[in-house]
Amino acid sequence: KNDNYTELGVETSINFPRFMFPFISNDFKRRIRATTEFGLQYNYQMRPEFTRIVASGSWSYKWGLQRQRSQHRIDLLDINYLYMPWIEPEFKNNFLNDEKNYLLEYNYKDRLIVRTGYSYIYNSAGQALMNNAVIGNSYSIRFNFESAGNLLYVLSKMSNLKKNDQDEYTILNIPYAQYIKGDLDFAKNIVIDNRNSIAFHIGGGIAIPYGNARMIPFEKRYFSGGANSVRGWSVRSLGPGTFSDEKGNFMNQSGDIKLDASIEYRTRLFWKFRGALFVDAGNIWTIREYQDQPGGKFKFDQFYKQIAVAYGVGLRLDLDFFVLRFDGGMKAINPEKGKDRYPILRPDFGRDFAFHFAVGYPF
């Protein structure tokens, strides 16, 4: 069996220390003190089953206010082209059949994502956090919103373009995604003394496909598990809902709604080492009932019963400029259908443990 996998990526950007946009007065450009960024990215993936190319171009603005406490970013235009030049015939026949797995079939097709977005970050620590200074209690708020495909959909309607056999409008025979997506996260750090603190965060997000799309593109869907989520699960291995993936297909373990919450006790150990005890909770869900994700749909009378919980310990190496993080998580409450509901009562290290290595704190 050929398991070779190659991925190559390159990206470049150019930044201008001013707000670059026609028809805007010079006085406004001076007052806003924004930077303008143009970026290009290219990613090439070659697997035994397929070859995949993702090419992107972006135009964005960034600026900060109130001694660096607030940061704004506007993605005026972000274009992503997903191109599948080759798919292995047997893989295509076995898995990329609309009747067998619409989720896979949808995400292994050429697709265009033309989006705009806005993000806002507020951190009460401001410049002290940027300088890695010792600070007291602080909190942060993160908000993101993006939409894709709306202008293209209006133009398609006005031009009376014909749809393809999947009931999608296309641009140069390439179907385009249409959706809205929003995320909100709140985090707080409470200092107990000069060696100990407690940090917690709660966040959520939702992505809704409409118009020209029946599904959110995989790149824009949510996942759960991993170093910055519910750490009793490996990355992309939890959810949606009670869904349990016996086939090991990571694309099936993605969703349109996400909830996450964590609390950590953090302490200084010695030298540059820090320790942590943590509890995480969360999951993902779909907004529709997909055949390949049974039990994944979000329901108000069920979702709270499907919250996964994990606990664990962490070791962090604070090198001033960045933090190396080693976390070990254990499953406590498992919502997956057919699995032990409360592994915390009968812990099995081989079954319940997940190790994570990451750079930076989880929140």
Where are these regions (language model features)?
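C-terminal structured "cap/appendage" subdomains that terminate the fold
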Residues: 294-344
